[in-house]
């Protein structure tokens, strides 16, 4: 008989609720401090991995007990994931960190069918969970007791001053192809709506990002991993797995001219991606994450219906918010344009959920792709038949013959 060991981390709600606090996510009004309790069932004598494949936490939200079930996101990284930065003298340094035992999870709340969760457990619990239609953020508190966490609603994060923040894609960038509404698509009731597809993603952080995060490579990597975990979650409704295959950090200088004109920077990044990046790393899509302030309150820009094109399967995104969830929404939005999605109406809702493809970013309860976005995506698949997103990310043997089939020319291919 297997003996079950319960590993318990003190469960309690801190004896007060705070009215205001400064957290990594910004200035937060109305939060509560909780101590999550981790419950792990292990056979007697078993060696506990640092990050288990499945975990369960108990905590109290608004005074009510909540059980959070988490499962490791095993599709977050490609198996040949790499990280690249540069020495002060311009020497390129590429490493292949082990990602088998990573700390990024997705999950749900027990007894809440509409719940979701996207959590990093690298240093405490950090991320979001959707409970009874409300979006909550959780992050560790820097207190004498290391197990204390803040839980707060996204709507309680103070909004930044200034006008609405917008995507830079306009009608001038869009084609006028007829689309199929999601409700009109012929889906086999015994099959999923969309066949499973895979996007191998490269993210490049520019030199301003490196300086913004005080030359701390680890901080940039951790932030990007958190964000991609959110992106991966959003795209599950389309049966798309977004896997990070390389994270590049321009630690010594910018390798294109990064300017406040989003259109010019996007054009330059696309040229660099085709002439340089594509020869360095197999990928389907590349995003430039920049700390420059883009003109006209623009948060990002992308080409429409360009996935698998070696020059235009790119986006640029401004690092506009300390909240990883909101950065994930923006980056998922711009990627959506590459996958054929046009903008929703500015007040688009899917039930009580905000539509990801709204033209402007609005902090809300939660985010999903609309039926129209799904229709645009299906039309893109039908018209363009993108091949690069059909292949599942696999480990690449650097001495093996390059494998084709992704519409992007690999080094060594004809």
Swiss-Prot record:
Its cofactor is Zn(2+). Residues 21-190, 394-414 form a propeptide. One of its GO terms (cellular component) is extracellular region. Residues 1-20 form the signal peptide. Its main location: secreted. It is found in: Secreted. Binds 1 zinc ion per subunit. One of its GO terms (molecular function) is metal ion binding. Expressed by the venom gland. GO terms for biological process: proteolysis. Zn(2+) binds at residues 333, 337, 343. Monomer. This is Snake venom metalloproteinase. It comes from Crotalus molossus molossus. The lineage of its organism: Eukaryota, Metazoa, Chordata, Craniata, Vertebrata.
């Amino acid at each position: 008989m297997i003996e079950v060991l319960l590993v318990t981390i003190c469960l309690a709600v801190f004896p007060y609720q705070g009215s205001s606090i400064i957290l990594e996510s910004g200035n937060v009004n109305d939060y509560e401090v909780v101590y999550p309790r981790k419950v792990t069932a292990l056979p007697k004598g078993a060696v506990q991995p640092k990050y288990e494949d499945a975990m369960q936490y108990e905590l109290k939200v608004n005074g009510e007990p909540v059980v959070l079930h988490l499962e490791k996101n095993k599709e977050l990284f490609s198996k040949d994931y790499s990280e690249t930065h540069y020495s002060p003298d311009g020497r390129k340094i590429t490493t292949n960190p082990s990602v088998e035992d990573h700390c990024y999870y997705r999950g749900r709340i027990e007894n809440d069918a509409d719940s979701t969760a996207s959590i990093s457990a690298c240093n405490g619990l950090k991320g979001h969970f959707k409970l009874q239609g409300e979006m909550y953020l959780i992050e560790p508190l820097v207190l004498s007791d290391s197990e204390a966490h803040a839980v707060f609603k996204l709507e309680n994060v103070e909004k930044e001053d200034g006008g609405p923040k917008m995507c830079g894609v306009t009608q001038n960038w869009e084609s006028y192809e007829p689309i199929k509404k999601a409700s009109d698509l012929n889906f086999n009731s015994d099959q999923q709506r969309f066949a499973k597809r895979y996007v191998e993603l490269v993210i490049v952080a520019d030199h301003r990002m490196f300086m913004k995060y005080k030359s701390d490579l680890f901080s940039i990597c951790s932030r990007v991993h958190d964000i991609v975990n959110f992106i991966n979650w959003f795209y599950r409704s389309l049966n798309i797995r977004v896997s990070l295959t390389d994270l590049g950090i321009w630690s010594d200088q910018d390798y294109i001219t990064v300017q406040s004109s989003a259109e010019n920077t996007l054009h330059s990044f696309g040229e660099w991606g085709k002439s340089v990046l594509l020869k360095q790393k197999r990928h389907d899509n590349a995003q430039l994450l920049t700390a420059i302030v883009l003109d006209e309150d623009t948060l990002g820009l992308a080409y429409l219906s360009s996935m698998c094109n070696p020059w235009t399967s790119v986006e640029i995104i401004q690092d506009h918010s300390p909240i990883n969830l909101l950065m994930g929404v923006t980056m998922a939005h711009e990627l959506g344009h590459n996958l054929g999605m046009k903008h929703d109406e500015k007040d688009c809702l899917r039930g009580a959920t905000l539509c990801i493809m709204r033209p402007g970013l609005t902090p809300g309860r939660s985010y999903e792709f609309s039926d129209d976005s799904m229709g645009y995506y299906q039309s893109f698949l039908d018209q363009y038949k993108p091949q690069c997103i059909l292949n599942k990310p696999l480990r690449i043997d650097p001495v093996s013959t390059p494998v084709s089939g992704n519409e992007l020319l690999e080094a060594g291919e004809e």
